[in-house]
């Protein structure tokens, strides 16, 4: 019973496939019909299957009809193939009988039959006769001399009157040849279609066509009788040739020789006496194939013809598009915004005078080196018939790409990006792989920066990992990660589900054309449901191998280390399939991508670079975006110094003059001078753009506000600890706007909040957002004096949520922090069994023992927690006022340094204002 029941159940996706409809439609119908199903992989009974077929009856009918048509076409095709095979066999038999038949043929009667034709062509008997002479006269030139008298005697007896009885007598005497002659005559008629293509090559045929065309032009009235006599003559002449010359070569010579004849009369008639053509198997099979392909019944060949025609049309269309593109390229100029007339003239192949004259005619008075705005450049381009495309200063000064030599290419480690939703265990997975605690320093388990790490496996192979931040605010950063990556590990928690961010990660990977390896995490939890995750992934467009797809899948537990080694094996297998190559030549100039940049107090600007080509070495001059520098030191992700870094190696680079942006390409230059020139060129263009923009924006915005009814702008200044966070914040904030208010970022930068930022905010009526950074003491006092709104965050999507709610007018009271006081560490003491204790001086306010504190180093937040102890001399105290010294230690944190500032605060509920 159980077996029968199992056999009578059907999967929804299979039924949908059979009906050729969407599985979702079938699933929807089953749910409406009261079926208890979860997904398209659920099973239904036979009754439900019949109901589905009933509902989708039209689709089923269509599918059945299509199936019937296919079967009918197949049957017809088989029948046609059988017919063609039989026809081929029949032709083979005819060919064999043809080769046997002429052996007992009479030699003497053939010329007499040829003389039969003149009575029909009564007007020109002389023209009809010479062909009888031609082959015979020309034959004596080869070896057989015996043939000459045989044919010459009838030629001497030329009178036409005598010719008729001569024909009748021999036919009556020999009844045998009569039987043979019709056979030889009928065969050429049946085989005429097959012989025709073969005749084109010979000289005889060319002569024949010319003669016939002449005859057609001169004597149209006798065209039919002439053709009939030619067919008869051809049959008889073939009979003679096959008997006269036993080997084929002699026959060929006889037939081919008359072309070189001297006599004009001979030339006229020579075409009628054709040699016997040997029937070729290839010709027969070719003709059969062409006949079959020409038949309308043949569905297969018809569809093939249709496909060929379609393909040809596509090729023609592609060619036309390519031509159009080439034409458009000729009229396309790529220029930076605010280019001068002189630069435009060079790009358009004109003189600067023509550009300036055109500007005058448009009512604009310009000089040769004056910068033109975007609209003016577009107008000038249109006037001269050019299409204008605006590019950035970096694109305008990009160094030429060099082609890699095949001998320099070697297999390189794969660059793997770990993607997935917030808190699904991406960093925990990388943490287990690296066997070091990365997670501890991250805020609330959320990765804030792109980290690049190289992992060495036990067998000596390497993998480079990019750990991208998980939240939607980091779309831009994650997109950057996908651009440099080879393989994506998509982490999905088995106790959760496929979230919007997971789908977003899938879309990024697909857009970048990167293969996905699915890692289903947290399988050690009791509520884990792996099959549900696979089903949801299939709906999101990722079909795992277990379900017949291409994406590899591995069940893992990042905490316990289950399945990690298998996951890495699958990643390496995917990398082997991709055949990843890198240029390992030491003669070329290296290049790489800036993954992340930050400002370090002792080291200056430090950037994480993923090397893509060549070897990056200490001392190399380079350009990255608008900044240049010289490699002062290279370090791996653990801070260990190295001398060089090859392809797919992440490395921290010291030696930048300015802060580069994440995603900038780092290019090593031949000399310091080249690097400086290129960087300066880019900086000039950028400064020009910024200057132009800042001088224009105010006037334009006033005009626009008047037009749109005072559309307000929320001005924002962003300060953060790294460039990647700034980019993500800026991108997120620019997307937030409603009909009344829009967000405008007037300034952004890396580092602590300074007095300059506060003054700019006061002048522009802006708010300041500090992401993992704090203001210095003077900036804080100035902000309080100016009554500015300065906000501090450590998680990006909290910023976006607050701004969005503020714009929607949905601000609820918030938990606001109130500063109590701050103290500065002036000396550090090491106390046994306790750890580091700071000797501190209270700068302002009052520091109490139970207050929450944060440790700031160079304005950047390092630690947030509580005081462990607060002492004056040897006594524990509850609070210390400004101007007094005290000893402090922090709960759970020991890394206190001289110069650190500890800020005490409390959380109070406050009405929001933004």
Curated annotation (Swiss-Prot):
Region described as G4: spans on this chain: 521-524
Compartments it resides in: Cytoplasm
Keyword Phosphoprotein set for record: no
Region span, G5: 557-559
Top-rank lineage group of the source organism: Bacteria
Positions of the UniProt region annotated as G1: 420-427
tr-type G domain ranges (all copies): 411-581
Sequence similarity: Belongs to the TRAFAC class translation factor GTPase superfamily. Classic translation factor GTPase family. IF-2 subfamily.
Chain's role: One of the essential components for the initiation of protein synthesis. Protects formylmethionyl-tRNA from spontaneous hydrolysis and promotes its binding to the 30S ribosomal subunits. Also involved in the hydrolysis of GTP during the formation of the 70S ribosomal complex.
Protein name in UniProt: Translation initiation factor IF-2
